[in-house]
């Protein structure tokens, strides 16, 4: 392992495996999740083309700690993978989607000793609901900020 430096990786993305497994089971919002080669997942939103596969360190938050150690880094700030923010979903489904994604992200980093920190995501179709989710993520979950897409459907 490299000597630990006082560095923080401030730009990382991930999608918790348990979130994708839950969506695969429930088909939340009509989203399809299929197994991909190598243990990953392919997500398809209703009416959209399948996304590129999510696999490896994108899904495995324990692997991230090993990667940080190998880089001599102290912490990593993770935002949900932009491809799965769920902006394609109608407002009600989108709010459930981001709430479950934010909760799963916090569960995934809980055992990291605060070496992994998280940004929330928000569904932007209903600004008041997005503001409530941001407040919940900051005050109840302890997320450090939020990451939103720059290109919205429609």
Regions found by a protein language model. Give the residues of each.
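Helix-coil boundary/capping segments in enzymes
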Residues: 1-154
């Amino acid at each position: 392992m490299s000597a630990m430096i006082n560095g923080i990786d401030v730009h990382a993305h991930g999608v918790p495996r348990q979130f994708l497994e839950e969506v695969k089971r429930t088909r939340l919002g009509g989203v399809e999740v299929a197994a991909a080669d190598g243990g990953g997942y392919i997500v398809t939103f209703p009416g959209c083309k399948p996304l590129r596969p999510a696999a490896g360190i994108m899904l495995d938050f324990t692997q991230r700690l090993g990667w940080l150690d190998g880089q001599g880094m102290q912490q990593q700030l993770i935002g949900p993978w932009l491809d799965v923010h769920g902006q394609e979903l109608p407002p009600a489904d989108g709010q459930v989607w981001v709430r479950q994604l934010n909760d799963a992200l916090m569960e995934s980093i809980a055992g990291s000793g605060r070496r992994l920190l998280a940004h929330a995501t928000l569904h932007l179709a209903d600004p008041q609901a997005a503001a409530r989710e941001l407040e919940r993520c900051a005050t109840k979950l302890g997320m450090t900020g939020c990451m939103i897409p720059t290109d919205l459907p429609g």
